[in-house]
Amino acid sequence: MMTRRDAVRWLGSASVGACFAASAASFVAEAFAAATDEAPPTLAPGAPMSPERLALIEAFKKQSDGLEKKYEARALKGDWTMPYRLFKPEATGKLPLVVYLHGSGGQGDDNLKQLGLGNIFGTRVWLLPENQKKFPCYVLAPQSNHGWAHYDPAKLEKGVYEMVPGMGQGAGKALEVIDALRKEFPVDDQRIYVMGQSMGGGGTWNMITNRPNFFAAAAICCGSITPEDGTGSIETPVWNFHGDSDNTVPVSVSRERIAARRKAGGHPLATEYAGVDHNVWEWAFTEPALVTWLFAQRRG
């Protein structure tokens, strides 16, 4: 029988076509049958990139080029305005909603940066034609200039950013956007997914902690340090990714959260990439199993 390590190695060296094609489900099931969420984080092959993984990433960049143009520019106004981008699928009926939270490089109010640079992976993978064919969904990419974590309001007025427990200002506003979209479009409330990288990964922990049992699943890449310790909303399926050579957010941050979540009764999946620095999103969002795993999750 395939071991957990063999399964992840196989996924890491899958063919370019298998990375995005619907037929990938055939080996995803076997890989997860061999995986147990109680095991230590799987150490997957990492830097220097194998030719197979490099081919996957380059193929993704080529196939996804220009997909950002399919996002509609919108904004939610209020006490402060949150710009956001929305992809609307061609399919009809109740459909899932994927929410992507950008990293610090996506901050601002231009409604552009959250789709560019390192964010291309997390915002475009869902739009690939083969993924939309099998897993049609709405995709939301909000942009925050307030971060995603919760900052002490009194100190924030003085320009001091001190994180404290509670719903983040940016995260809370993004949830307002989500709720507005649920009223405007036929979103499947049982299949709302959230994910993010770096600062957005920390924001993902903030969201699932402070709005428990709302999201069907979460995918987190190198989540930044926030007051959230990983124990919030333990029923929510989580797949956490981190490079073991991350010089920006130490891998220990993810290890501690995953350990705490398991101790509290949760069952998160965790994958570490050997030799990979902070750009783990290039690996995570081209992981052949991720798309199939995500859309298999359903709340309730």
Can you name each region flagged by the protein language model?
Residues G106-A171:
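Active-site machinery of serine-nucleophile hydrolases
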Residues P237, F241, N247-G300:
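C-terminal catalytic histidine-bearing segment of alpha/beta-hydrolase fold enzymes
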